[in-house]
């Protein structure tokens, strides 16, 4: 089965072609970072308009790179949620129009299920069951995964997601959008131990997260340094390191608890924050101690992309699932409501 995948949940337009027998044939991505950077964050209306502009050229590009014609596509998968409603509607409308024109089925994919399954595109994919840490700008969740659609939520953020905390903290410190890579870049030059930030919600049982207080603590520390006349680049680097260490250690502690609670030895990390090298190293060290294994997608498939949507959609299409002709999206959507296959 040859599936065209479309991703438009936020500020990246992703398109890919996935073959159920040959794997990923081609993928293309257009990022809107430069468009939104001047505003310090994503402007939903601008995101939607840019998706409209980029979608068809990217589809033509992917078909050409794969050496395929539209008539060879067997189905279209698209991100149906969660995400920005206008951006989602662009992808859904395009997918349903193409499916109607080509006489093929369409299927809406849960954005976070796409992230969760992205490591399946690698040469050594994880085997079920496993624990998944989903860390992105909108989500921080620990999920027990027994199969596609068989998800048990173990814990989640009660306020800011980890990626959101990175972006907001960076903005408060005067760094460029998106903030995660900027903080990681500065942290490489930071002085270990100069600042020590709290590890939120690690002093109590449970697997939930909270990063809003850490964001405020970081801002207060930065403001105190500035008030004392120390707003040097080195101080900025030291604070970035302390913040990143706090987030990484908090996530690692919670993942260790989740593995112990479930008795599993395999951990998948997915979502934009999973590209953070400090987080990867920390989790790899922890899994080595537990004699387990950690899995993640290659960096370009950690952020939003069409390949993960094409793959996830292909699995559901092969199981006989597809949508009707109605154009419908779900800006808020729990993965636990997805049917198992």
From Swiss-Prot:
Any one Gene Ontology biological process term? tRNA threonylcarbamoyladenosine modification
The record's keywords, sorted A to Z, are: Acyltransferase, Cytoplasm, Iron, Metal-binding, Transferase, tRNA processing
Enzyme nomenclature, EC number? 2.3.1.234
Per UniProt, what is one GO molecular function of this protein? N(6)-L-threonylcarbamoyladenine synthase activity
Database matches in PANTHER family: TRNA N6-ADENOSINE THREONYLCARBAMOYLTRANSFERASE, TRNA N6-ADENOSINE THREONYLCARBAMOYLTRANSFERASE, MITOCHONDRIAL
Give the function comment from the record.
Required for the formation of a threonylcarbamoyl group on adenosine at position 37 (t(6)A37) in tRNAs that read codons beginning with adenine. Is involved in the transfer of the threonylcarbamoyl moiety of threonylcarbamoyl-AMP (TC-AMP) to the N6 group of A37, together with TsaE and TsaB. TsaD likely plays a direct catalytic role in this reaction.
Which protein are we looking at?
tRNA N6-adenosine threonylcarbamoyltransferase
């Amino acid at each position: 089965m040859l599936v065209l995948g479309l991703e438009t949940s936020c500020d990246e337009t992703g398109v890919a072609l996935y073959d159920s027998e040959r794997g990923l044939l081609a993928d293309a991505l257009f990022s809107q970072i430069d468009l939104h950077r001047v505003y310090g964050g994503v402007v939903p209306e601008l995101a939607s308009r840019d998706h409209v502009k980029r979608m068809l050229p990217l589809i033509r590009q992917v078909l050409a790179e794969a050496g395929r014609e539209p008539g060879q596509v067997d189905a279209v998968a698209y991100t149906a949620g969660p995400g920005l409603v206008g951006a989602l509607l662009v992808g859904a409308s395009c997918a349903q129009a193409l499916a109607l024109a080509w006489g093929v089925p369409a299927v809406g994919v849960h954005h976070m299920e796409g992230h969760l399954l992205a490591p399946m595109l690698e040469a050594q994919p994880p085997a079920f069951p496993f624990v998944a840490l989903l860390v992105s700008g909108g989500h921080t969740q620990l999920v027990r995964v027994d199969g596609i659609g068989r998800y048990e939520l173990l814990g989640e953020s009660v306020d800011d997601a980890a990626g959101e905390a990175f972006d907001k903290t960076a903005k408060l410190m005067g760094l460029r959008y998106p903030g995660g890579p900027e903080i990681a870049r500065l942290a490489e030059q930071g002085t270990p131990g100069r600042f020590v930030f709290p590890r939120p919600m690690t002093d109590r049982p449970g697997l939930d997260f909270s990063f809003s207080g850490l964001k405020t603590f970081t801002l207060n520390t930065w403001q105190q340094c500035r008030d004392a006349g120390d707003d040097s680049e080195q101080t900025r680097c030291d604070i970035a390191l302390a913040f990143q260490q706090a987030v990484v250690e908090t996530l690692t502690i919670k993942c260790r608890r989740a593995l112990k609670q479930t008795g599993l030895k395999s951990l998948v990390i997915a979502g934009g924050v999973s590209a953070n090298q400090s987080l990867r190293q920390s989790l790899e060290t922890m899994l080595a101690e537990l004699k387990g294994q950690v899995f993640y997608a290659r960096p370009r498939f950690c952020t939003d992309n069409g390949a993960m949507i094409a793959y996830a959609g292909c699995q559901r299409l092969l199981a006989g699932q597809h949508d009707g002709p109605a154009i419908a999206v779900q800006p808020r959507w729990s993965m636990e409501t997805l049917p198992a296959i």
